[in-house]
Swiss-Prot record:
Keywords: DNA-binding, Nucleus, Repeat, Transcription. It is found in: Nucleus. It comes from the Eukaryota. This is TATA-box-binding protein 1. PANTHER family: TATA-BOX BINDING PROTEIN. One of its GO terms (biological process) is DNA-templated transcription initiation. Coiled coil: none annotated. Sequence repeats lie at residues 58-134, 148-225. Belongs to the TBP family. GO terms for molecular function: DNA binding; RNA polymerase II general transcription initiation factor activity. Pfam families: TBP. Belongs to the TFIID complex together with the TBP-associated factors (TAFs). Binds DNA as monomer. General transcription factor that functions at the core of the DNA-binding multiprotein factor TFIID. Binding of TFIID to the TATA box is the initial transcriptional step of the pre-initiation complex (PIC), playing a role in the activation of eukaryotic genes transcribed by RNA polymerase II. The gene is TBP1.
Length: 233
């Protein structure tokens, strides 16, 4: 697949604040410190789980839930705060809450998509809050079939990467067309994760259903990235 096919919103990189995909790669990262101690913020990092000493930071969780009732979207948009509805543009109410800072897409069928949360727990909490808002507007909404659909994370390996060499040697998994998209797209088979690798050393990982897939994918790719570390002039 050509690099042009990568849409940041499809990957779940868009957040509730409408940030562009490129803004995702600036997240924090845990790295090995002196004496072998590894810290992420104030939290120690388990080297058995993260041998690289780098912990990808979750940036966006996309989840879905079934409210299990038909909804009058026009009524919801008129009565709810922080809600907008323009059926000519998009067939869903767009609703936002501040805590957790998220955006929901609410469809007339009762299906809902929640995006923008930074953890699985916050995604579920936000989805429950949206469901309660709909209930308070008079709809018999329930909370069925909650599911994490995509986890997006980012990290920084702190060294530049020779993307041309990586693309050549890993052509079966890689797509790199810098005139169309600045990053190399690496489609890992196991776990089935898509990685966006940038020359700066910034990495975006997407396509996971559970966070351990993110961690496993990064530990798989990290030794490969070190092979293509660009020598500093």
């Amino acid at each position: 697949m050509a690099a042009a096919a990568v849409d940041p919103m499809v990957l779940g990189l868009g957040t509730s604040g409408g940030a562009s995909g490129s803004g995702v790669v600036g997240g924090g990262v845990g790295r090995a410190g002196g004496g072998g101690a590894v810290m992420e913020g104030a939290q120690p990092v388990d080297l058995a789980r993260h041998p690289s000493g780098i912990v990808p930071v979750l940036q966006n969780i996309v989840s879905t839930v079934n409210l299990d009732c038909r909804l009058d979207l026009k009524q919801i948009a008129l009565q709810a705060r922080n809600a907008e509805y323009n059926p000519k543009r998009f067939a869903a109410v767009i609703m936002r809450i501040r805590d957790p800072k998220t955006t929901a897409l609410i469809f007339a069928s009762g299906k809902m998509v929640c995006t923008g949360a930074k953890s699985e727990e916050h995604s579920k909490l936000a989805a429950r809050k949206y469901a309660r808002i709909v209930q308070k507007l008079g709809f018999p909404a329930t909370f069925k079939d909650f599911k994490i659909q995509n986890i997006v994370a980012s990290c920084d390996v702190k060294f530049p990467i020779r993307l041309e060499g990586l693309a050549y040697s890993h052509g079966a998994f890689s797509s790199y067309e810098p005139e169309l998209f600045p990053g190399l797209i690496y489609r890992m088979k196991q776990p089935k994760i898509v990685l966006l690798v940038f020359v700066s050393g910034k990495i975006v990982l997407t396509g996971a259903k559970v966070r351990d897939e993110i961690y496993a994918a990064f530990e798989n790719i990290y030794p490969v990235l070190t092979e293509y570390r660009k020598s500093q002039q």
